[in-house]
């Protein structure tokens, strides 16, 4: 998603660049586009693809001959070498523009043709143009005569015998003798169509010194050729052109051609001082007037660059040739001295003015409010206004370091050039820019690239981790290396019992040593029972001294007794009571225990034999609920019983207890039972031993034994 957004931003910046244009077919192809509206706007078509192909777009504004088309330029910035905008009307000569005129253009005659041309071949392009037009009826001045066709002619053309209106309305109703005061005076012969070869000179149009009206159009040409290869500077010190009059300046000798045109002046330039600089050492000045023109013409001077007129003062050394110096103004007149405007590039004409200390420049001419304010050279043309009227930021031939000079002779910050936002008043800081993305797009692209790089690193890390895990799974079936084999195939450390048996550590009292040849559970139980037999008191009397067991062993024995795996220890009284309850059927128990008569003789009743465990009591069958209670009878004392071991083997008791706990369902199946007999009594005893594990000892004995040592759980 982020990459798609960046691509859209880049594409939007490319489409918004002014060097990409496309010309609409209705204006840039034959026939030209016809505009029938009374008013409207026109602008240079926007560029889309490239600047390789030339273009020629034409618009035709239709109107009647009685109407005047007024054209106002909101913007006009064209590259004079490769772009041109021309305007033509029936009553107006061709006007060629690449910069905006100072005032609106009024083109009489109705139909006006506007043509925009571009050379192509990737030639430089300006910012384009934007103009508005309107068709109005021409309102004549007080000293003019309005014809029936709404044209305005001079009042002196009224009844002069010449049809100036075109419809004869200016001659209608006139007597045969014209008014003597309106008869034109003869014009004296003045120098015209001459060549001026001096290094400097002065020339003027015919009739400039005195106002004279000519009844026919007039054209004059001056060739300026001082025979020097340096450039010429032609300065028009006074302009008073009539409506329809024009002055054209061409570079080089020869007949006037539009390709060599340097500047065109009309009545819109009246009252201004205009300087034209040639590209070569020669120039041609052409002057054209219309019939009965009320303009006086012009007055001009010329000189070779590097020289000044005798009545002018030279500028300082800092005003030599170079970029940004203007139109060859290396000289200034006395009227330009201390007027608050820099006519020299280094400000020589504004140095040492009254009211300012040395090294300072005044903000205005003498006698004005700005004459008392002075500024240093470092405060000039730095895009920071010092003077109240901004005189320190006007007519900048050079800008302070870090600033850019606009074509309107003002300065802006250099970092603002070609940033996509016009900062100069004429927008020249965005002209002739190579394709540069705005800072916002560049910032977004950098941040996006960093994020993408981070995501790529994370993806690579995850891939490597997954690959390592997959490789580790496959390595299970691979042969182990020597180091891995040593780690995996290590022998387990010996147990505590093995260490005691091997003599590595001293034996602990009552801790069963492990026999390497006997690893069965039965062997371990026999070892445990052996310890229990050794724990019995040899005499069996109450005063016999018990052998002290280890703490671990005592804890183990207590747990086995609690679980019912070992019988409780009985007192002598309980042992004698058990002997009195033994039946003759207990004789086969001696055979089950595996003991012999002589071997049993060594034991004593009541626990005298240390190796004999106390006998297990016989469980009496519970009375059935369905049977009626029988009268209580005292059983007769049985006869003498054969000798019976009172204390069955501890091993058999433990084994039977394990059998009863683990295999409780084992028993002799059969639906019927035979009457009890001597043999069945023995089997019943064994079965009862299987069912009844170990009777619980009396609470007093258990408590007394528990108080012997607390149980740690």
Swiss-Prot record:
InterPro entries membership: CUB_dom, LDL_receptor-like_sf, LDLR, LDLR_class-A_CS, LDrepeatLR_classA_rpt, Sperma_CUB_dom_sf
Job description of the protein: Probable receptor, which is involved in the internalization of lipophilic molecules and/or signal transduction. May be involved in the uptake of lipoprotein APOE in liver.
A GO MF term: low-density lipoprotein particle receptor activity
BP-aspect Gene Ontology terms: endocytosis; inner ear development; lipid metabolic process; lipid transport
Subcellular location: Membrane; Membrane, Coated pit
Ranges in the topological domain labelled Cytoplasmic: 462-713
Transmembrane segments: 441-461
The organism of origin for this protein: Homo sapiens (Human)
GO cellular component, one term: clathrin-coated pit
Annotated family: Belongs to the LDLR family.
PTM annotation (Phosphothreonine): residues: 596
Signal peptide segment: 1-16
Domain LDL-receptor class A: 139-175, 307-354, 355-397, 398-434
Limits of the CUB domain: 28-136, 192-305
Keywords: Coated pit, Disulfide bond, Endocytosis, Glycoprotein, Membrane, Phosphoprotein, Receptor, Repeat, Signal, Transmembrane, Transmembrane helix
Keyword Transmembrane: yes
Extracellular-facing ranges: 17-440
Chief location: membrane
Compositionally biased spans, kind Low complexity: 621-636
Tissue expression per record: Expressed in blood leukocyte, lung, placenta, small intestine, liver, kidney, spleen, thymus, colon, skeletal muscle and heart.
Region span, Disordered: 564-637
Highest rank taxon of the organism: Eukaryota
Disulfide bonds: 28-57, 80-98, 140-152, 147-165, 159-174, 192-220, 308-331, 315-344, 338-353, 356-374, 363-387, 381-396, 399-411, 406-424, 418-433
Protein name (database record): Low-density lipoprotein receptor-related protein 10
Statement: the UniProt record of this protein carries the keyword Repeat: yes
Membrane topology designation: Single-pass type I membrane protein
